[in-house]
């Protein structure tokens, strides 16, 4: 190895000494990424103080320490001389290298290694492999014989850099959420999440993103925009009408050229260096779905094959995507779990722990909207909320302009903009009528603007760039659209491992697991009632809102117990539940607002159903995928879609009517009756309602793989095929003589007649009881024998029936890590275990204020307190019998007065009590069965 003597230091790539050994004795401090004021503001926004990260010198191999607080002054990268004991004296250095080190002056222990051109205060410590000049100033500080190790011939470069990267990996922590990163550029990009800054903006729809890759993915939706063309199928008439028709046609052509020119305009700003993707289309041969990349096609084809190539090495669970496997593997890792000191709940990340601790303290960062005063816990939520105000302001001006009547537009004088537009279109203003002049003026104002204005529909749907080709519904993300398409295709990728039932969404499967496990994790804090679904708990809490108002809760407790205060009126409450109920009185929150009429709703499902009212017949008859076909048959409708936002469809139609042009946007489509407005574009079937059309389109989308062996017709499901096969059979000749019901087969008729004749062929040999089916008899025999033949392999518990064993085994599927040390009973959550341990400890924490009786659970004391409530004395004066229901009490009194309030519905006979009525109804039943048996016997003799 050649060594150059001089004053330039040792280059990093030659590493004449063991650089890993050198880093083991250094101390690193992170660079400052923003000033002290921004850091203090970010730390103050946290619900609690962030954990301090300090790596001990004796325990950590890289000896890195992160300062708990930052200053505005940039830190220096200081080098400390390693002790002589850390290097082996047996290792001998190279002679040439030794001479070179002897020529270098020794460095001090506080010498900085950053040069003058490196902006450390802005970027922090960057990656060593891409910024090697950081190590050019390293100098020798100890004698060479003690510092340099012997050269290892078997050590390769790749292994050396891999070890180096392991030592300095993830040394850039975020001071807000404590998340760490490998490179400072990744930390700078991550800080945009906390600041809420979104610097990358789409110049087509105005949507903003915080990462350039998200913007590139978003721009693909604008790549394949179709241009509408105008076909002149009607000959122009004479006079003024001909001039107006020529103006409309010329305007449409000019609009198309302007739209094409605006699409080819060079982008500016942050998007100037963003290339559009040039990938070709790739089509799936099974469902004809088109993808931009071939890798996306391969990933999509796994849905059809059902293959799951990625499996977990711990639990052997398989997945069809690598990202899903990576997300699942984190659930098995316990190395990074942090625990809450209050409730003991564990988390994999510190950021999740900080969010969880805010639920105990009751405090959260307050980001308020300046327009409406609404507050949010995260800056991203505030930015999304502000977009609602921006869309509302953008919609007000175009809507006012659209409401201008046509008569006032025609009366407007000819402006300079109108004359310039007429000269652009090659039309003389003096030779056209007022209707054509109005249209020219609108077009002139369109060209006079510096940029094309968006119509109100585009502004309203600016955040919904992914539209469904079946029902036309828009979504803001491509993943949401893919999940929505499962409704039309019938795809259900999520399957229950217990019963095999399939679901479209993963959270539907999670909710379905409650049916098997019978787990009820959602508990009411007031009465202790538990529920399996959060929606059930929300509906249950509405009962307490009526029974326990806020004044009742505040009047029975001392002031020191009222820890939750209202920020609006200052009233205090004992818990967050009563505080939330009180805040609803202030704001009456209905967060879901209709963009068209402004109506508010409390649930998003109600808003979705409400939006169907505003959909016009033209939008429902022709989905978005068919807009290009419809535009080819419209001469005036093209002007309506490319004209400025203040040119309404009524004005264009009036101008065309003045010119004598028949502007029928649906002239190439068959006329649909007024009663059935919505027609299918595939088969032509018509429907009265739009939902009927959407439901009908499932027939064309679902794959039909089951064929009838008689006529060859295909079906999607086995049940549909079974119903179809019965149409090929003869009529139902097997009729029940008692009730007249008809059956396809004689076996079905015989099984049905057992209900009338009470024929029970399967009888018990011990008690003589008869049953309709054999498995009923097998279940009944367990009562006499007491045999429990079904045994659980996990806990050795035995059961009498197989269904009971299957239901018991489902409890072992769900993890129950919380075990009681006294009785061994297991629980899923720690809160349930703590509540259970009160029984062993004898702690009855709930005491009745009236009688002093104590209870273990809050549900027990609530049930007990009902006995203290004042109730009417419903006691019979004759027999001293007590009743809870006034209805039964009044009927009971009639029996002592000689009345017969209980009547038979068949014959009208009345009885004084229910026992006599039940015996009488049983007599009617036996009469019907005897008549049916006699009728069957008579048919057998014939």
Curated annotation (Swiss-Prot):
PANTHER family: IP01243P-RELATED (PTHR24393:SF15), ZINC FINGER PROTEIN (PTHR24393). Residues 66-106 are annotated as: Disordered. SMART domains: ZnF_C2H2. Residues 96-106 have a biased composition (Polar residues). SUPFAM superfamilies: beta-beta-alpha zinc fingers (SSF57667). One of its GO terms (cellular component) is nucleus. Its main location: nucleus. InterPro entries: Znf_C2H2_sf, Znf_C2H2_type. Keywords: DNA-binding, Metal-binding, Nucleus, Repeat, Transcription, Transcription regulation, Zinc, Zinc-finger. Gene3D superfamilies: Classic Zinc Finger (3.30.160.60). The keyword DNA-binding applies. A zinc finger (C2H2-type) spans 172-194, 200-222, 282-304, 310-332, 338-360, 367-389, 466-488, 494-516, 522-544, 564-586, 592-614, 678-700, 706-728, 734-756, 762-784, 790-812, 818-840, 846-868, 874-896, 902-924. May be involved in transcriptional regulation. It comes from the Eukaryota. It comes from Xenopus tropicalis (Western clawed frog). Pfam families: zf-C2H2, zf-C2H2_6. This is Zinc finger protein 865. The keyword DNA-binding applies. It is found in: Nucleus. One of its GO terms (molecular function) is DNA binding. Belongs to the krueppel C2H2-type zinc-finger protein family.
